[in-house]
């Protein structure tokens, strides 16, 4: 979503003369002006793709559901003390500008030319970063992939397909709740079949995704980006290899519901890297929590940094303070790591820190870190690269499934009252 910020016209400066509440979401509300603005964004995005633009009324239910989920995640972030500093925000804005082949100044000028507010754009990016960190803590961190799963995957036909084709896909999901009755499942199957029949007759996929799909990317036309066959539910791997670009798959049942995929592009697989740069690094991680906010966490990381600079032992302090369960008992030692397997902020600080020098405290989505580089080397890592690639595929697959389950869960557990005229009332 961030990369498309400029192109989608995501932030409007116009002030609505009248406003009203369209949904109560736990301790917050969603205003009609917010919904109307997001509807316009979606319509502009669809129009820029050359698709038929649905009327606002057709998009409102999807948009409102997206806003409700975003609001719930932002409230979670607030309760957990998750913050995005201005420095991090500036870096993210710079990345967005770079993706659009602009400097930050050119990006600001382009926003102004389109009648968009730079400050509003910054706040939207901030919100998306907070949501990303909430998901990291609530979903990604609890996903585990065993070494045996990796070995089994690499030995499987699906694992071997890792090295072959990639597919640029869009999807339409007709969701079924975990406890759905047989009648509800049958109704979803009938709806999915009806959509598939429309697509085979030439209906616009982007428009149907925006108005009918329950997938998180529905308002982006269902665009999933590039995926390996192994990252997809099993029914789709064989279909896509022999399917022409532009075609759609029949609906397939998955744990989350019935999915239809459209093949937008194909490309061949890439060869395995033979050599890999590795860094031997150790770190201390301090995480914010509901009882220790970001500022207090930063101060604690600074105190630990000062103690190491004053001669205290890094490993002993890591054992006492670090909240990385995978390395704390080893004195913070991460051993030899591939920089590309690390989050960008950690990777950047590590690359800029000379060997044997302690970094100043810095922040990532996990919390505040202090690191020390113990060594650098280049090694033949063909087998490790294959294992890491398999690990990433399995983790991404589990993440996609777990995220959808978690989003349904927080929606079901929240108090939500819909006040949009003509919409179904839902209060929990």
From Swiss-Prot:
InterPro entries: OMP_Chaperone_SurA, PPIase_dom_sf, PPIase_PpiC, PPIase_SurA, SurA_N, Trigger_fact/SurA_dom_sf. Residues 164-265, 276-375 form the PpiC domain. Its EC number is 5.2.1.8. Residues 211-230 are annotated as: Disordered. Keywords: Chaperone, Isomerase, Periplasm, Repeat, Rotamase, Signal. GO terms for biological process: Gram-negative-bacterium-type cell outer membrane assembly; protein folding; protein stabilization. Residues 1-13 form the signal peptide. PROSITE patterns: PPIC_PPIASE_2 (PS50198). Pfam families: Rotamase (PF00639), Rotamase_3 (PF13616), SurA_N (PF09312). It is an enzyme of class 5 (isomerase). It catalyses: [protein]-peptidylproline (omega=180) = [protein]-peptidylproline (omega=0). It is found in: Periplasm. One of its GO terms (molecular function) is peptidyl-prolyl cis-trans isomerase activity. Its main location: periplasm. GO terms for cellular component: outer membrane-bounded periplasmic space. Chaperone involved in the correct folding and assembly of outer membrane proteins. Recognizes specific patterns of aromatic residues and the orientation of their side chains, which are found more frequently in integral outer membrane proteins. May act in both early periplasmic and late outer membrane-associated steps of protein maturation. The PPIase activity resides only in the second parvulin domain. The N-terminal region and the C-terminal tail are necessary and sufficient for the chaperone activity of SurA. The PPIase activity is dispensable for SurA to function as a chaperone. The N-terminal region and the C-terminal tail are also required for porin recognition. This is Chaperone SurA. It comes from Pseudomonas syringae pv. syringae (strain B728a).
């Amino acid at each position: 979503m961030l990369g498309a910020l400029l192109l989608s016209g995501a932030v409007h400066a116009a002030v609505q003369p009248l406003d009203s509440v369209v949904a109560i979401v736990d301790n917050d509300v969603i205003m009609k002006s917010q919904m109307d603005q997001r509807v316009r964004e979606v319509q502009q995005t669809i129009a820029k793709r050359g698709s038929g633009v649905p009327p606002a009324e057709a998009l409102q239910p999807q948009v409102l559901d997206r806003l409700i989920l975003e609001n719930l995640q932002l409230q979670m972030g607030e309760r957990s003390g998750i913050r995005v500093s201005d420095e991090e925000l500036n870096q993210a804005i710079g990345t967005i500008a770079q993706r659009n082949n602009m400097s930050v100044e050119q990006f600001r000028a382009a926003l102004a030319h389109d009648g968009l507010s730079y400050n509003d754009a910054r706040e939207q990016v901030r919100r998306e970063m907070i949501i990303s960190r909430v998901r990291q803590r609530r979903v990604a961190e609890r996903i585990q992939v065993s070494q045996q799963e990796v070995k089994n995957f690499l030995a499987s036909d699906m694992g071997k397909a890792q090295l072959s084709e990639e597919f640029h896909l869009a999807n339409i999901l007709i969701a079924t709740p975990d406890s759905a009755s047989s009648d509800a499942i049958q109704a979803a199957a009938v709806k999915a079949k009806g959509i598939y029949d429309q697509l085979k007759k030439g209906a616009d996929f982007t428009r149907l995704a925006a108005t009918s799909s329950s997938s998180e990317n529905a308002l982006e036309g269902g665009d999933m980006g590039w995926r390996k066959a192994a990252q997809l539910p099993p029914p789709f791997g064989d279909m896509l290899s022999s399917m022409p670009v532009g075609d759609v798959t029949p609906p397939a049942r998955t744990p989350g519901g019935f999915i239809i995929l459209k093949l937008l592009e194909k490309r061949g697989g890439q060869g395995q890297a033979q050599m890999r740069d590795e860094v031997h690094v150790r770190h201390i991680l301090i995480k914010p929590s509901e009882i220790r906010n970001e500022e207090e966490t930063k101060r604690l990381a600074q105190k630990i940094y000062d103690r190491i600079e004053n001669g205290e032992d890094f490993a002993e302090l890591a054992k006492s303070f670090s909240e990385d369960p995978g390395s704390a008992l080893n004195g913070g030692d991460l051993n030899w790591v591939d920089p590309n397997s690390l989050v960008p902020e950690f990777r950047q600080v590590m690359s800029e820190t000379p060997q044997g020098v302690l970094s100043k405290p810095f922040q990532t989505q996990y919390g505040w870190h202090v690191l020390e580089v113990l060594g650098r080397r280049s090694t033949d890592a063909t087998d490790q690269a294959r294992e890491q690639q398999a690990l990433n595929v399995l983790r991404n697959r589990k993440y996609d499934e777990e995220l959808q389950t978690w989003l349904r869960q927080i929606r079901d557990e929240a108090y939500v009252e819909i006040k949009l005229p003509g919409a179904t009332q839902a209060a929990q």
